[in-house]
Amino acid sequence: MALLREYKEIAYQWGIWKTEESPEELLALLPDPERYEQQLTLFSSPHRKLEWLSVRVLLYQLLGEEKTIEYAPSGKPHLADSSYFISISHTRGYVAVILSPVSEVGIDIEQYGQRVHKVAHKYMRPDELISEYQGEDTW
């Protein structure tokens, strides 16, 4: 399994998954794989299938139960049973999910690189900026 980080509090919880599995391996991590197989046929891109499945596996890992993710016309995700607010992000083989039972949440994950470095000052306080790149994975 590729759960890289997980953090839980009363007000929210989040996790980061590094996708290293095949679609078949990801399906095997879910309690009811058949539930997802038909939806997978809607994706033509193998990469997109992996992202989509990784989000569902991460959500299951965080909550310990399956939840259905639906999307508003704007593309914003929400859980069908409204038990949690949810935000989803993905970048180059990683997915992140944050959940809160009490308030709207947001998460964004980006692979560190020149593109992020050039715009980080627009979205982050000085104390949040990474002052020095320290390896492949910087948290």
For every predicted segment, state its role.
Residues 1-139:
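Core catalytic alpha/beta fold that binds nucleotide/phospho-ligands
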